[in-house]
Amino acid sequence: MHFYIGTLLAIALFKINKLIYYHYEVSHCSGKGDKMKTFNIASIPGDGIGKETVSAGRQVLNTVCDVHDGLRMEYLDLDWSCEYYLKNGRMMPEDGLEVLRSCDAIFLGAVGFPGVPDHVSLWGLLLPIRRTFRQYINLRPVKLLPGVITPLANRKPEDIDFLVVRENNEGEYSNMGGRLYQGTDQEIVVQNTVFTRYGVERVIRYAFDLAVKTGRQQVTSATKSNGINFTMPFWDEVFAEVGKTYPAITRNQYHIDALCARFVTHPQDFDVVVGSNLFGDILTDLGPAIAGSIGIAPSANIDPTKEYPSMFEPVHGSAPDIAGKGIANPMGQIWCGAMMLDHLGFADCGELVMQALTETLAAGMTTADVGGRSNTREVTEAVCSRIRMLAGTVA
């Protein structure tokens, strides 16, 4: 009952804030004296190191707000997690999606906890958010940053710098299928893949638009039409149709197995890569691995229309084995904050965070997972300090 009343009050306050600030224009990080813009952010630390990384990410975002008098963030703290599931039998309350609907964005840490199967957190929290709010784009940058060591030999930062666009709402992860004759030697299991023309076309078009927006020259499609004889040929057809409307952008296509190999052997060949839900999932983990560490990789679940809140989460898991030790790498979460700022219309502020993050890494201020000796707090404070210096205000 107390939670329900609190939820109603939170929603009311959020809506009041939106009415107050609706008429304000979005300013830029380089401009002082602009009118204030307030964003309401749902903060979901989740499990394990998520509590530490979200705290670090918020510290960096608050520093950006401190140096920019036209930007403010207010947080709605939500304890939804696998631990919440163990206590309540569900990953979030019944009205959880309505709570999130009132927010401008969702800042998520990591979910996962011993004793709770991964499919529980996926289907109980992440997928309902992605699908209810039409976050049909999962965007993950793959970039080798200065100071980070790649497992690939003789590769420099300019060799690994591309974007992976994953279809996030349908495809192979559709909840359709079933099992018959369970436990017998005649058991039958069927998992259906669902592609729609609308869904495939919009994600591919997003990839081409992204190439144009970021000044990249080519879009590469992940397929497997030599073995999957209905959905993948359809995907290829739509890719070709959409691609023809972007004559200045080169189209490439690889089967997923060959594409994975090429990520390793020729990462410099890619600008924007687009794939279905499953293939994109595979590539968006492989990409950060070749860039040095999943621990610094960000992820954005985006509704490009901005009708609904988008969700920003690092690629890394909850890492319960190091939770609470203060050694978690906060860079992935901080990078997520930069992507969130860009999505909310403060691209200059996102670039400021990325410059501070990059300079911090280049200076060797890193955690042990990428070869450093610093802890979570030290890395976070170093990024915040650089933001202040870059913005011309030393605290």
Which residue ranges define each predicted feature?
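Short, Lys/Arg-enriched N-terminal segments with co-localized hydrophobic residues
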Residues: 13-35
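N-terminal phosphate-binding or glycine-rich loops at protein starts, especially the Walker A/P-loop
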Residues: 37-75
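Glycine-rich phosphate/diphosphate-binding loop of Rossmann-like nucleotide-binding domains
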Residues: 42-56, 184-256
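Buried hydrophobic positions in well-ordered alpha/beta secondary-structure cores of metabolic enzymes
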Residues: 47-50, 104, 165, 207, ...
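N-terminal beta-loop-helix "entrance" segment that forms/cooperates
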Residues: 70-93
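Glycine-rich phosphate/nucleotide-binding loop
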Residues: 82-84, 262-365
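A structured beta-alpha segment of the ubiquitous adenosine-cofactor-binding alpha/beta core
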Residues: 85-98, 251-270
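N-terminal glycine-rich phosphate/adenylate-binding segment common to multiple enzyme folds
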Residues: 85-190, 278-280
